[in-house]
A protein has these predicted regions:
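Local sequence-structure signature of Cys/Sec-based thiol-disulfide redox active-site neighborhoods
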Residues: 1-24, 28-36
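Thiol/selenol-based redox catalytic cores and closely related redox-interacting motifs
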Residues: 33-116
């Protein structure tokens, strides 16, 4: 089993996800969104499963800095913004084959491990 974790090194939940998989000896490939933004196609997988609103971190500093509190964008515009501004993403985004999660989801990850 191998997972891919999208997040930033500064994000506490991303570090918890890395530790969760490390403690269970699951190989995890980390993608630091601050250095390498996620591709549009990769984000589309998460949008199709959860919707674009689930991916936007309305509590993030970047969200406030950009003044998005009153923003009313289409899903397409939000997706474009998330590609351009990866620090707006709610992290970690975790993918294992076709299984996906947004945010800290340890019980879900545990079920993935149990099923493998």
């Amino acid at each position: 089993m191998e997972v891919q974790i999208f997040g930033t090194r500064k994000c506490a939940d991303t570090r918890k996800a890395q530790r969760f998989f490390s403690e269970r000896r699951v190989r995890a490939h980390f993608v630091d969104l601050a250095e390498r933004p996620a591709a549009r196609g990769e984000l589309m997988r998460f949008v199709q499963r959860f919707g674009v609103s689930a991916l936007v971190d309305v509590e993030s500093r970047r969200y406030a800095d950009l003044g998005l509190r009153a923003a009313r964008f289409s899903d397409e515009r939000w997706l474009a913004l998330l590609v351009d501004e990866p620090l707006l993403l709610r992290t970690p985004l975790v993918r294992c084959q076709q299984r996906l999660t947004v945010g800290l989801a340890e019980s879900e990850w545990a079920s993935w491990i149990a099923a493998s």
